[in-house]
Amino acid sequence: AYTGRGDLEHLDEALVAGLDAGMTVNEIKEILVQAYAYVGFPRSLLALQTFMTLLDERKAAGINDTIGKEATPVPDMDDTTKYALGKKNLAELSGVPADAPASGYAVFAPVIDKFLKEHLFADIFDRDILSWQARELATVSVITGVGGVEPMATAHMGICLHQGLPPDQLSALLNIIEINLGPEYTMPLRPVVE
């Protein structure tokens, strides 16, 4: 949530907590890289720089964090194949059939639908460092931290539920966000898990 909000001071503390809880360096990097798709390059890059500085400080203090596995390279594909993969991944992720008619922004600005399917749901979601459940939990956290994007946050919470995350796990995430950012960020989202 701190990445979405751009709160680097508190992000640093959350990164320490993640490492201390057993997350690997590569798992955290993957979350921060994926965040750019939801909050833009500036916040993602600043979060990555914050993480780099933290790792340097920990190393200097004699703390050796677990790097973790590297992502299996996503095969090179032409745009048509990549679009088809992204479309398939999105359908599996959301439960919305791949052949459902386009609507909303996908009709108004078809190029954004192309970018989402080829890049976010093929290039990023096909990487194997994080499960889809972990990616969606991270997405809910990041976009909730942005504030004012409740329709997106509730949609991603629905995807979490579709992916088999229990409502109490989403509720626990909202509790953590509420403790750290305040109830104004979480109250509009509570009906999804109640």
Model-derived regions, located:
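Substrate/cofactor-recognition hotspot
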Residues: E30, Q34, V39-P42
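Short runs of predominantly hydrophobic/aromatic residues within well-ordered alpha helices
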Residues: L11, I28-K29, S44, A134-L137, ...
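Short, structured motif recognition centered on aromatic/hydrophobic residues
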Residues: A1-Y2, L15, I31-L32, A134-T144, ...
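Short amphipathic alpha-helix initiation/capping segments at coil-to-helix junctions
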Residues: L130-S131, V146-A153, Q163-P167
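Short conserved catalytic/interaction loops centered on acidic-Pro-aromatic/His motifs
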Residues: D12-A14, E150-G158, S171
